[in-house]
Amino acid sequence: MTKIDIQYQDQFGKWRHLQSKHNEGDAYRSASNRARSTGKRHRLVDQDGTLLDVIEP
């Protein structure tokens, strides 16, 4: 079972950890909703560090 980390980009351009999920669809939905509400870029990264997706607000 893969772990997916949700990260967001702060005002200085540094990626910060937000939370981890095991379901990719749920992770995308959470990141997408939070990107829209906060106006910050979010990304999904798997446990190997592979970039899965970047969500723009």
Please report, for each region that a protein language model flagged, where it lies by residue:
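Short aromatic-glycine-(Arg/Gly/Cys) micro-motifs in beta-strand/loop hairpins
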Residues: 1-17, 46
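Local beta-strand/beta-hairpin segments that build beta-sheet-rich folds
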Residues: 17-18, 52
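Sterically constrained small-residue positions within well-ordered secondary structures
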Residues: 18, 33-35
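Solvent-exposed serine/threonine-rich low-complexity stretches and specific carbohydrate-binding patches
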Residues: 19-23, 56-57
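Charged, amphipathic alpha-helical segments
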Residues: 22-31
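Short, mixed-charge low-complexity intrinsically disordered segments
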Residues: 35-57
